[in-house]
From Swiss-Prot:
Residues that, per the record, bind [4Fe-4S] cluster: C12, C96, C198
CC cofactor note: Binds 1 [4Fe-4S] cluster per subunit.
Catalytic machinery residues: E126 (proton donor)
Function: Catalyzes the conversion of 1-hydroxy-2-methyl-2-(E)-butenyl 4-diphosphate (HMBPP) into a mixture of isopentenyl diphosphate (IPP) and dimethylallyl diphosphate (DMAPP). Acts in the terminal step of the DOXP/MEP pathway for isoprenoid precursor biosynthesis.
Name of the protein in question: 4-hydroxy-3-methylbut-2-enyl diphosphate reductase
């Protein structure tokens, strides 16, 4: 039974940065520190940080006045930022810079009084943060659509002053169809200068497209609440390859592998490589051969840390 590994897979630059912010804050300021929302959507990562003294909360009201708080990689609304400032909380913002880019687009549209459509998944923290960047005081509004059916139902105030942005972790193919529907219904709509779907999401989806057709089954390492991990599973299934989303190696059902000759393995952008290694170990114990790395796009992007948490600043 062959084991084929997708490339790239696993951690992206934004996730690396967010986790490192929490770890360095714990090193510098000591436990406990508070994190608004799970810093990234991965159970293994969150449990490890919790064991180090990170306390994950849903609302700022759960953070004592004298404690440090970190905003998750998914970003927060202007209202949350304003509340933190009003209370004088010490904040480190672990929002992915690519999410911040979308926030800036939304703020620019709202300043210009342009209505804005966000393509994204209802209830996802990134969507809540992005929607919360829009200032309605200039007469515009922001709308959320998930699919083409939502586009058909949508009514806006002024189709001649309309823009769109997207959540960064969506399916590229699904998003392209929604954008086509928007352009068909609102011919004057303007989009971002550069695609909002992040490089890591695109690269990992491309890697699955390259791999899934040659495999009898795909295993996606990632947590159920990880948007980008779910999109990888859906993509493999859309290509006709059975796919399973697993948090850890113990969740692999040997029955999935019965009669299979080639197993593809990938990991969402919030899943650490140690979990992939555990999956490979279990697959080998179940009859798998030595894994083969499938070539893919190399990633070299690194996002800088907040100044106060940089190693040179800490050492001083």
């Amino acid at each position: 039974m062959q084991i084929r590994l997708a490339n790239p897979r696993g951690f992206c630059a934004g996730v690396d940065r967010a986790i490192e912010i929490v770890n360095r804050a714990l090193d510098v300021f000591g436990a406990p520190i508070y994190v608004r929302h799970e810093v990234v959507h991965n159970k293994f990562v969150v449990d490890n940080l919790r064991n180090r003294g990170a306390i994950f909360v849903d609302e700022l009201g759960e953070v004592p006045d004298d404690k440090l708080v970190i905003f998750s990689a998914h970003g927060v609304s202007q209202a949350v930022q304003n509340e933190a400032a009003r209370r004088g909380l010490k904040v480190f913002d672990a929002t992915c810079p690519l999410v911040t880019k979308v926030h800036m687009e939304v703020m620019r549209y709202s300043r210009d009084g342009r209505e804005c459509i966000l393509i994204g998944h209802h209830g996802h923290p990134e969507v809540e943060g992005t929607m919360g960047q829009y200032d309605h005081s200039n007469g515009g509004d922001i709308y959320l659509v998930e699919d083409e059916a939502d586009v058909q139902k949508l009514e806006v105030k002024d189709p001649s002053r309309l823009s769109f942005v997207t959540q960064t972790t969506l399916s590229m193919d699904d998003t392209a169809r929604v954008i086509d529907a928007l352009r068909a219904k609102f011919p004057q709509i303007e989009g971002p200068r550069k695609d909002d779907i992040c490089y890591a999401t695109q690269n990992r989806q491309d890697a699955v497209k390259q791999l899934a057709g040659d495999c009898d089954i795909m295993l996606v390492v990632g947590s159920p609440n990880s948007s980008n991990s779910n999109r990888l599973r859906e993509l493999a299934e859309r290509m006709g390859t059975p796919a399973y989303l697993i948090d850890e190696a113990a969740q692999i059902d040997p029955a999935w592998l019965y009669g299979k000759k080639a197993i593809g393995v990938t990991a969402g952008a919030s899943a650490p490589e140690v979990l992939v290694a555990d999956v490979i170990k279990r697959l080998k114990a179940l009859g798998g051969e030595e894994p083969v790395e499938v070539s893919g796009r190399e990633e070299s992007i690194v996002f800088s840390m907040p100044k106060e948490l940089r190693i040179d600043a800490v050492e001083l």
